[in-house]
Amino acid sequence: MTIGVVVFPGSNCDRDVQWATEGCLNLPTRRLWHEETDLSGLDAVVLPGGFSYGDYLRCGAIARFAPVLQSLMDFASKGGRVLGICNGFQVLTELGLLPGALTRNQNLHFICEDAPLHVSSTRTDWLKAYGNAASLVLPIAHGEGRYQCSNDTLKQLQDQDCIALRYGSNPNGSVDDIAGITNPSGNVLGLMPHPERACDPATGGTDGRSMLKALLN
C-alpha cells in the first residue's frame, strides 16, 4: 500500500498529510511533484490543502492543467482512490472529477476553527469506518470554502447519495450544509475540512484518523 501526495507550487499541507500517512499510519508515502506523470505503484492519491499556484485567477484554476493531474484523471477513471482536501477539493471541481464550485465564504472572511460534522453517506470507502449519521469534529481553514452548485446538480448529488459530509453548524454558507462530496463511483472524495490535522492526540484530536485508515483496506 503506497500513497501519493501531490505537491504544487503553493501547497502547504502536503507535509501534514505525509505525517498523517507515514507518521501515524506507517503507510509508505511518495511525494508527487506537479510535473510528474507516473502514478504507477500507487494505491491512492491525496491532493492536499494550500494555495496551488498562488490561487491566481481562481482557486485550483491553474492547477487543473498540471501534468500530474492529467494522469490523475486516468487513475480515477480506473477506480483509483483520490482524496482532495481543502485546496485539493477546489482542484477536483476545477478538474471536473467532482461537480460544483467552491466560492468565497459568505462572510467574506478566512475561517479557521474546529467544525462539527455529520457523516451523510458511508457509500464511499473513505467514510465506512464512521457509520451513517456519525458525528465528528475536524479543523477547517479556508477563505473559499462555500460549496455552490445548480439545483439540478444538487438533486443529482442527493439522489445518488454523493453528499458525504455536512456541517453541523454551517460556517461558510455552503448549499445544503455540504462539507464534502464524492463522485458517483465513490472512489473520489473532496472535502474542505482537514482530516490530516486530526490524526494525533498531540495536535488536537483523532476524528480524522479513521478516514485516512481507509487507505489500509
UniProtKB/Swiss-Prot annotation:
Pathway: Purine metabolism; IMP biosynthesis via de novo pathway; 5-amino-1-(5-phospho-D-ribosyl)imidazole from N(2)-formyl-N(1)-(5-phospho-D-ribosyl)glycinamide: step 1/2. PROSITE patterns: GATASE_TYPE_1 (PS51273). Residues 2-217 form the Glutamine amidotransferase type-1 domain. Keywords: ATP-binding, Cytoplasm, Glutamine amidotransferase, Hydrolase, Ligase, Nucleotide-binding, Purine biosynthesis. This is Phosphoribosylformylglycinamidine synthase subunit PurQ. Its main location: cytoplasm. It is found in: Cytoplasm. SUPFAM superfamilies: Class I glutamine amidotransferase-like (SSF52317). The active site is at C86, H194, E196. Part of the FGAM synthase complex composed of 1 PurL, 1 PurQ and 2 PurS subunits. It catalyses: N(2)-formyl-N(1)-(5-phospho-beta-D-ribosyl)glycinamide + L-glutamine + ATP + H2O = 2-formamido-N(1)-(5-O-phospho-beta-D-ribosyl)acetamidine + L-glutamate + ADP + phosphate + H(+); L-glutamine + H2O = L-glutamate + NH4(+). One of its GO terms (cellular component) is cytoplasm. It comes from Synechococcus sp. (strain CC9902). Part of the phosphoribosylformylglycinamidine synthase complex involved in the purines biosynthetic pathway. Catalyzes the ATP-dependent conversion of formylglycinamide ribonucleotide (FGAR) and glutamine to yield formylglycinamidine ribonucleotide (FGAM) and glutamate. The FGAM synthase complex is composed of three subunits. PurQ produces an ammonia molecule by converting glutamine to glutamate. PurL transfers the ammonia molecule to FGAR to form FGAM in an ATP-dependent manner. Its EC number is 6.3.5.3, 3.5.1.2. Transmembrane segments: none annotated. GO terms for biological process: 'de novo' IMP biosynthetic process. GO terms for molecular function: ATP binding; glutaminase activity; phosphoribosylformylglycinamidine synthase activity. The gene is purQ.
